[in-house]
Amino acid sequence: MLSSILDQGSYLILSDFERQQQVLTLARSLIFEGVEKLNGPASRQELEQQGLSLLHNVLAAEQIGPLRDLVMPTLRPALLEMVCSIGRLLGIDDEFFVDDYTILRINFPYLVAKEASRSAENPGIGRVDESTRKQSVASKVVDPNYNPKAYHNNEPPAAWAHGAHRDTWTGHSRLGVNLWWAVDNVPEEASMVFYPGTLNADFEPDRRSLYLAEGYPLPKPVKMSLRKGEMLVFNPEVLHATHLNTTSVTRLAISARINPVRPRFSTSCFYAREFWHSSTNIEAGHFDRVLRFERNENLEPAIDRSVVPPKFPQLIELEADSHDNEWKRVCESVKIAEGGKLRVRFGNENVLLIRTSAKLHASQANCPHLGVALADGFHDEKQLFCPAHGLAFNLQSGLSSCTALRLRMYEVEERQGDIWMRATNRASVHVAA
Ligand code: FES
Ligand SMILES: [Fe+2]
């Protein structure tokens, strides 16, 4: 099992494992208790009636951090034990390591989270042992290129979602195995997004976001729903992302990480997750013994990948006014093969032309969420997937599963071997996504 995850980049979903029900019950009851401590018994009662997936109805986004502070220290020993038993289930016989950094991922629906204040925590922020916290604060490293606020377009941190990445790009260890555990039912559009087959592909991160740089086309994303209690186990070097939570429910998951061997870090990231528990200590009940593997002493030379330059679809620049109704000739039809894309600078607007087997479509070229270039996203006959957070846009209408995020569409026609387009009828499309 372990080698297929590590060597082939596959993933598996565990539906039944040791300590699963006991720790799930503990995690859920700690969340209910935390809500009661923060907002009183009436809020707890309301949450018990409505279900945890409606947590955002009783908790403000600004209280996600305080709730984590209440839940994680008590949950930590039981969680470490459960993670350790999963390591054994995966077939690791010898001593292995469990990351001290664990995350209670609370992703409110995007439309709720985007109204939060700046002080509300990012869903991807974890918690560590108290001793680790003090040491990490003392040795914090800052990279001047890294600017997550700019990537997230200054949206409140509670609304942030991870773009496509490998975990070693963000300071995690080599040869890790990620555990991602559904504390409540997780619908597909609030889940993880995977790009199978990308384990050994040549991709580069953008140094400003540590997510995939522009110019690397992605394969079809795999999205998966999980039932309450199911555990996704995957190789974090396969490109993966967080789906923008376009549902009306809060996503609740806990993530942890195993390293079958002593953790080592990539030279490509400026910091490293240095604090770990050994399976020997966890199995002996020593949950507060944390080992430190200092980055500088545990670096591994970068994997020798050829540096592949980014590849962008052809760009055609047209003089145009997007407010008039005039048709403009773009280029010869043969410039876009079936399944291909072409970028057009239409006056001062960026447009993406996409050819399916049936027809040509023209849409705005950047995602209405954070402006990421859609040219790298996979498309099929009906949909274009954003390469950042997996959102699917209908190629006919531009609609997505989020009412606030819709692509502007352009009219496009082929006449006697040429492609023509114009920017009209923007409000007249009524096709369902
Ligand atoms: S940038 Fe987030 S879904 Fe496109
Ligand atoms: Fe990740």
PLM feature spans:
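Short cysteine clusters
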Residues: 367, 386-389
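N-terminal auxiliary "cap/dimerization" subdomain that precedes the catalytic jelly-roll/cupin core
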Residues: 1-93, 302-322, 414, 419, ...
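Conserved metal-binding segment of the jelly-roll/cupin
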Residues: 226-239, 387-388
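Short beta-strand His + acidic residue motifs that chelate non-heme Fe in jelly-roll/DSBH
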Residues: 234, 239-247, 375
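Catalytic core of non-heme Fe(II) oxygenases with the double-stranded beta-helix
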Residues: 158-224
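Signature of the catalytic double-stranded beta-helix
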Residues: 53-174
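Non-heme Fe(II)/2-oxoglutarate
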Residues: 243-321
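N-terminal pre-ligand scaffold of iron-sulfur
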Residues: 309-380, 395, 408-433
